[in-house]
Amino acid sequence: MAREQDWIAGEVKFRDEFLRPAEVGVLWPAIDPSVWPSEETEHEREVWERFEHKPMGSYLLTVGRACYMKGSKEAVQVAAAASLPLVHVGGGETEEMQRQAEKFGAELLIMPRIDEIEIAALMRNAHALIATARTEGFGLTPMEAAMVGTPALVVDDCGFTHTITDGLNGRRLPWPNTEEGLREWTEAIQQAGESANRTAWSKAGRERILSRFSANHQAEGLARSLAAMGVKVEISDLEILPGLDPA
C-alpha cells in the first residue's frame, strides 16, 4: 500500500516546468505587537530607568549590523548634518562608523549587546529611526519604530517601499549622498520632532502593520500556499492585502 505523501518539496508533481515549487509567492514577514506595544509598559519603564547606556537628550537610532549594505556611513552623515547623536545597535563594522563620525564631526554611540526590551525602549525614546540600507529585502525596523510611536525615516529604495508611504506613516527620502539629499533628511528629522507628525505617522503605521503584517496574516499566507499545492490544511477568510505600497 502506497504511503500517503506528506512531504511535497521534492515531488515533481508539485513543481512547474522549471522544477520550481508550484504556487509559491511572497510570504511577508510579521510583527508581534506584544513585543512592540503602543504604550510603554511598567516593565519597559523600569528597564529604561536603570539602563546604564541611556543616551542624554535627543538622538537618532539605527539598528542592524554595520556594513556597506546597511548604509552605516550614510547614517553617520545624516546625523552629522542634523547635529544629533547617532545611536547604533547591532555591532558589525563599527570602526568604520567611528572613522566616519570623526570625519564629519558626528557624535556616535555604539551600544553593546542589549536585550529585546532594551531595544524597544531605545526605539521608543528616539527622536527618529533612520534606515539607509542598500537593496534591503524588506526592512523590519521601520515597522517596529511605528509600533512604538517613533518616526521612521528611510531611503526610498527596495524593501522600505513595502512598509513606508511618504508622509503617511513616515518619510521616504533620497540617498543622502548629495547636498540636496542631506537637506531633505535634515528637514525630515525636524518634521519627526513635531508631535502631530509623530502621532499621525505612528497611527497609520500601526494600522498598516496590523492589517497586513501580523502573525495571523503570515500563518494564513503560508496555509494558502500549502493548500494551493494540494496539502490538506485549514484556511480562513482572513483578508490579506498586498504588501506593496498602495501609493
Residue ranges and their predicted role:
Residues 50-70, 76-81, 87:
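Conserved donor-binding/catalytic core segment of Leloir-type glycosyltransferases
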Residues 31, 63-66, 83-98, 112-113:
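Glycosyltransferase donor-sugar binding loop
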